[in-house]
């Protein structure tokens, strides 16, 4: 995320995007919680993760579950499929802070909370609250800030539960149309709500939003529905119509097909982010807020989780 803390430079700088990473996950491989077992007739998600960092990672940053300053996790528990994305606020770089470490630690804490015996999979906002509390109450907490979007699909009622704070977000696609889409939470243009652990002596200098401020929603799902979580590197560069065009081109919903579709989305978003003449969603929003921006895409890290709702064959 190229954004401000409370002091934001007027113009954004462009960076080359040179590195791609990918991850695929068929739900169930990470199932570790022992408290109950899944029914063989329960719905499940076929999930893939794809992303690009806007520039090559520096030595020592090549950890899993990061695309630049973005992070993510995918977990499968007996009660729910769980996923999340987080976008570290890039303004921390000016203070010599790894802007992506906070996002990674936040996602790791949320992922760990899903393995507790009392996790029921129906309140991702409570999951975000618990994950942030774990992170912020460490003896030596990681300094930084991040947006967050969490989603769970509960197996028993095939319902998607979401919690979104900031300008990452989610989509539910059914029969080629967007059925549900999250709404951004921002303080100002390019200044999203963000969870923050500030330095002890400078708390007044940062936006410190609460995880309780995350917007929660629930949506009934059907087999064949697509669920997409992404950071703003996707949404700021790719119009919804273009995203749908790629997703609707999927011939099947297997792991390989989803990965191919996710890769096409990420690559197209990356291409648009470097196009100085393209009227991107970000450029349009800048004009609407009377912000000086030359137009074109917004170079940024891009993280995408794409899932298809499936039911076992009888």
UniProtKB/Swiss-Prot annotation:
PROSITE patterns: PPM_2 (PS51746)
Annotated keywords: Hydrolase, Magnesium, Manganese, Metal-binding, Protein phosphatase
Binding-site residues, Mn(2+) 1: 87-88
Binding site for Mn(2+) 2: 87, 232
GO cellular component terms, semicolon-separated: mitochondrion
Molecular function, one GO term: metal ion binding
Record field: catalytic activity: O-phospho-L-seryl-[protein] + H2O = L-seryl-[protein] + phosphate; O-phospho-L-threonyl-[protein] + H2O = L-threonyl-[protein] + phosphate
EC nos: 3.1.3.16
Any one GO biological process: dephosphorylation
Required cofactor(s): Mg(2+); Mn(2+)
Domain called PPM-type phosphatase: residue spans: 43-309
InterPro entries found in the cross-reference section: PPM-type-like_dom_sf, PPM-type_phosphatase-like_dom, PPTC7
Pfam families: SpoIIE
Cysteine disulfide partners in this protein: none
Family: Belongs to the PP2C family.
Protein name, as recorded: Protein phosphatase PTC7 homolog fig
Species the sequence originates in: Drosophila sechellia (Fruit fly)
């Amino acid at each position: 995320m190229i954004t401000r803390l409370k002091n934001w430079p007027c113009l954004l700088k462009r960076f080359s995007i040179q590195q791609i990473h990918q991850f695929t996950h068929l739900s169930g491989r990470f199932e570790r919680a022992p408290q109950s077992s899944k029914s063989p007739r329960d719905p499940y998600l076929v999930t893939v993760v794809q992303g690009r960092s806007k520039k090559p990672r520096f030595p020592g940053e090549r950890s899993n579950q990061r695309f630049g300053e973005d992070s993510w996790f995918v977990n499968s528990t007996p009660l729910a499929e769980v996923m999340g994305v987080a976008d570290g606020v890039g303004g921390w770089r000016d203070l010599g802070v790894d802007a992506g470490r906070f996002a990674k630690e936040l996602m790791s804490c949320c992922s760990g909370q899903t393995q507790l015996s009392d996790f029921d999979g129906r309140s991702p906002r409570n999951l975000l609250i618990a994950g942030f509390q774990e992170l912020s109450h460490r003896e030596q907490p990681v300094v930084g800030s991040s947006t967050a979007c969490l989603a769970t699909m509960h197996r028993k009622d095939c319902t998607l539960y979401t919690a979104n704070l900031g300008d990452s977000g989610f989509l539910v696609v059914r029969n080629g149309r967007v059925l549900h889409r999250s709404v951004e939470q921002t303080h100002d243009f390019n200044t999203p709500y963000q969870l923050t652990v500030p330095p002890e002596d400078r708390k007044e200098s940062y936006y410190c939003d609460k995880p309780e401020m995350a917007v929660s929603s629930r949506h009934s799902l059907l087999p064949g529905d697509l669920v997409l979580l992404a950071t703003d590197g996707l949404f700021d560069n790719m119009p919804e119509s273009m995203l749908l065009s790629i997703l609707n081109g999927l011939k099947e919903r297997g792991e390989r097909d989803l990965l191919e579709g996710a890769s096409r989305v990420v690559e197209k978003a990356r291409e648009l982010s470097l196009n100085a003449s393209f009227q991107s969603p970000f450029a349009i929003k800048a004009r609407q807020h009377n912000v000086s921006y030359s137009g074109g895409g917004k170079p940024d890290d891009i993280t995408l989780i794409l899932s298809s709702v499936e039911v076992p064959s009888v």
